[in-house]
């Protein structure tokens, strides 16, 4: 069995709005394959808003 790991850090605040839904998609073309997400990690830090700076 071949195993692959994908790891990517993306600064989401630069590319998505405040509220989003995250999904996964995978394909192998014409062949059958099972894709499993065995681990998922998400971390969020709220930035300072303009109202809190006053």
UniProtKB/Swiss-Prot annotation:
Give a yes or no for keyword Hydrolase in this entry: no
Q: Keywords in UniProt for this one?
A: Lectin
* Lineage top rank: taxon: Eukaryota
Question: GO molecular function of the protein, one example?
Answer: carbohydrate binding
Q: Which family does it belong to?
A: Belongs to the leguminous lectin family.
How is this protein organized at the quaternary level?
Answer: Tetramer of two alpha and two beta chains.
Protein's recorded name: Lectin alpha-1 chain
Question: Can you name the source organism?
Answer: Lathyrus cicera
Phylogenetic placement of the source organism: Eukaryota, Viridiplantae, Streptophyta, Embryophyta, Tracheophyta
């Amino acid at each position: 069995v071949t195993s692959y790991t994908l790891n990517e850090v993306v600064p989401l605040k630069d590319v998505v709005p405040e509220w989003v839904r995250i999904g996964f998609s995978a394909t192998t073309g014409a062949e059958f394959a099972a894709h499993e997400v065995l681990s998922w990690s998400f971390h969020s830090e709220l930035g300072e808003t303009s109202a809190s700076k006053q």
